[in-house]
Amino acid sequence: MSRQKNQNSKGHGVSKGKEREQRTLIRFKTTLMNTLMDVLRHRPGWVEVKDEGEWDFYWCDVSWLRENFDHTYMDEHVRISHFRNHYELTRKNYMVKNLKRFRKYLERESGKTEAAKCDFFPKTFEMPCEYHLFVEEFRKNPGITWIMKPVARSQGKGIFLFRRLKDIMDWRKGTSGKKPTGVETQPARANMNPSGSHDTRSSDDQKDDLPVENYVAQRYVENPYLIGGRKFDLRVYVLVMSYIPLRAWLYRDGFARFSNTRFTLNSIDDHYVHLTNVAVQKTSPDYHLKKGCKWMLQRFRQYLASKHGPKAVETLFSDMDNIFIKSLQSVQKVIISDKHCFELYGYDILIDQDLKPWLLEVNASPSLTASSQEDYELKTCLLEDTLHVVDMEARLTGKEKRVGGFDLMWNDGPVSREDGPSDLSGMGNFVTNTHLGCVNDRKEQLRQLFRSLQAQRKAPS
């Protein structure tokens, strides 16, 4: 169970090793009323609790995390759905800072070729603090399109495109010296102080120090890959169970989100052309759910294979694997590692005409609200398999490379599809254990997995 640290509770009267085995019910808590609640309520042996401090598993929102995590004691078996400073990866400005820092580290330690593997995000500047650097870059490349994004908002809120320096100057003048209004709370970065503990000041401590809402100015990808003349991006799910060591799973299913209007650079003010967020697209006057604003990743992969051949598709998806791993490695040393925490990230990836993937952002709270029956089924399976990997029931051995729709892609090093030790000396025949957009026969895999685990438990030692 969890409890406030000042309650001086001693815990249960059995050893921690046996405590987990003896639990007959998993007590869960969540405030999210969407697909997640359906999955939790229908999971065998799980029961919902309302009281604070009486849960074994809490799928919380990030606001609860900021206010309560540091004051909550958790028993060995307790799990919670976010890392303390998840925003090092999921806030747009922190993500870019960490990726830039990691790229410099790789260049220094491994050379330019290895560092170039981090060149998967568009040139980005934090505003307003890097305004002068941005202006310098802007003047080097006049006429290109830029996109402004608030660092802590989602669902396309506050985003605009521009090509003239006057537009950004007007924006800067319009916000300079004003307190932000309607802005999400800015989480404090967790810094290591000389004593070795983390500085976890609340976001409210820093809010008044911010004269304006922070944005990033990012070079807009002007040559996106189009299907049916429409722009799209990909939503991919990555589950991180640990940062030290890094242990990450990639889900086989995901989807492509299409804009509702044919792509053109002649109307940069039209969000229905340039923003693929469902929250934006569903406000379009001619939006129809059955029109096809989402494709499952398996369909998308098959489409690309028919157009470009299997080899080009393998290269593209391998490049996306690189994005997932390098982005996680970029924050591995700054994320506060905690055995109670896991995180289901939603990656947003854009593909350009050259089949190069670009990382747009990473979401700590990817939408779990279904927009269609197909979307509901995907998210239900995703969440069921997330709970299988988290393994509150203690059924897994820890050696599994696949659980349902999740494939273990990194376990303190790359994971091979083949069984046995990995020979990474030349990487000649090494194939990463990822199957994004491939067949997801999760039900049959889970049936075989749990049957095998049950047989192992019954076998004489």
From Swiss-Prot:
Gene giving rise to this polypeptide: Ttll9
Name used for this protein in its record: Probable tubulin polyglutamylase TTLL9
Residues bound to L-glutamate: 257, 294, 379
Transmembrane stretches, start-end: none
Binding positions (Mg(2+) 1): 348, 361
Similarity comment: Belongs to the tubulin--tyrosine ligase family.
Organism: Mus musculus (Mouse)
Lineage of the species this protein comes from: Eukaryota, Metazoa, Chordata, Craniata, Vertebrata
Cellular component terms (Gene Ontology): ciliary basal body; cytoplasm; microtubule; motile cilium
Catalysed transformations (reactions): (L-glutamyl)(n)-gamma-L-glutamyl-L-glutamyl-[protein] + L-glutamate + ATP = (L-glutamyl)(n+1)-gamma-L-glutamyl-L-glutamyl-[protein] + ADP + phosphate + H(+)
GO molecular function ontology, one term from the record: protein-glutamic acid ligase activity, elongating
Domain notes: Gln-155 is the main determinant for regioselectivity, which segregates between initiases and elongases in all tubulin--tyrosine ligase family. A glutamine residue at this position is found in elongases TTLL6, TTLL9, TTLL11, TTLL13, TTLL10 and favors glutamate-chain elongation, whereas an arginine residue is found in initiases TTLL2, TTLL4, TTLL5, TTLL3, TTLL8 and favors initiation.
Cofactor(s) essential for the protein: Mg(2+)
Tissues showing expression: Highly expressed in brain and testis. Expressed in heart, kidney and lung. In the brain, expressed in ependymal cilia, cortex, corpus callosum and striatum. In the testis, specifically expressed in the seminiferous tubules.
